[in-house]
C-alpha cells in the first residue's frame, strides 16, 4: 500500500517528507530510507506538527524493522523506538504513535509477514489522521460565525498533519460550509511557521490571509479586528492545560483580556492522561542559532546569551474550548476530558 499527501509520501520502502524548512520558496522532498534518517528529519524539523510527527515516527518504526540485521529482534526494535522517541520531547503524539506500533509488533513478532503488518498499521494511522482532522474541522466550524476574522499561531494545518489540519481544518471546514472567513497568521518567531507555512498553505487554498508580526496581536484585538483565536496543540494535560508553540500563552492572555474566544483544536491522541497539569509537561529547548539567525543571517550580536523554549503552556482558565474529533470539550475540563477519554 502507498500514501501520498502534500506532507509525506510512503512508497513501501522509503518515506519522502516535504522539507518544511525551505518553504515557501522551495518545494523539495527529503527521502528517508532508514529509521535514523526519519529521526533526523523529525529532530531537524524537516517535518513538524504533533500529528505529522507521530505518523512519521510510525513509518520510521517500520523502516527500523527493515534495518534489522542480527541479534535480538526485540532488543533492536526497542532501540529503534528509543531513537525515534528522543527526537522531540514535548509532542505527545510521537510517543502515542510509537507505543501503538510497539504493541502491534509484540502481538505479531513471530509472524512471517511482520513488516507488512507494521506497514499496514502505520498506513491505518495516517488515514485515520485525515479523517480525525476532518471531524475536528466539522465540530469546530460550528463555533465560527460567518464573516469572522480568525487569528492563528504557528502552523496547525495540512503541513502539521498528514492532511487537512487541526486549527486550519476548522477554518477549512467553515469555508466549505459557505462561511466567509478571513485569517490573520502571526509570523511565529523564531521559526516563522506562520509567515512561511500557514500563509503559504492558505494562499494555495485561496483563503484570504494576512501575515502579522507577533507583537501586533494585542492591538488588533483591542481594535476589534479579531473575532476568535484558533490554535493547535502539542500536548494537552488531563486538566486541559495546553502546550503549544511558544507565544500561544501570550495570545491566550490577550484574548482573555479582550473577551475573545480562544479555541484549541487537537485530536484526542494529543491529550496525555498521565499528565495532570501543564506543570508536568516537558518543554523542549532548541538551539540558540534559531533566535540569533534569520534566513541564515546573524541578527544578534556574537556571544549574546539566548533562551529558546520551543513551547509554552496555556492554563485551562484561558481556554474557551478544546475542539476534538469526538466533540467540543468545555469547562470543567478535567471532568469532561475524562468523559471523552472514558477514564
Curated annotation (Swiss-Prot):
Q: What name does the UniProt record give this protein?
A: Methylthioribose-1-phosphate isomerase
Function (record text): Catalyzes the interconversion of methylthioribose-1-phosphate (MTR-1-P) into methylthioribulose-1-phosphate (MTRu-1-P).
Coiled-coil regions listed in the entry: none
The entry lists its GO molecular-function terms as: S-methyl-5-thioribose-1-phosphate isomerase activity
Xref: Gene3D superfamilies = translation initiation factor eif-2b, domain 1 (1.20.120.420), Translation initiation factor eif-2b, domain 2 (3.40.50.10470)
Lineage here is:
Bacteria, Thermotogati, Thermotogota, Thermotogae, Thermotogales
Provide the E.C. number(s) assigned to this enzyme. 5.3.1.23
List the active site: 234 (proton donor)
> Which pathway does the database say it acts in?
Amino-acid biosynthesis; L-methionine biosynthesis via salvage pathway; L-methionine from S-methyl-5-thio-alpha-D-ribose 1-phosphate: step 1/6
Reactions catalysed: 5-(methylsulfanyl)-alpha-D-ribose 1-phosphate = 5-(methylsulfanyl)-D-ribulose 1-phosphate
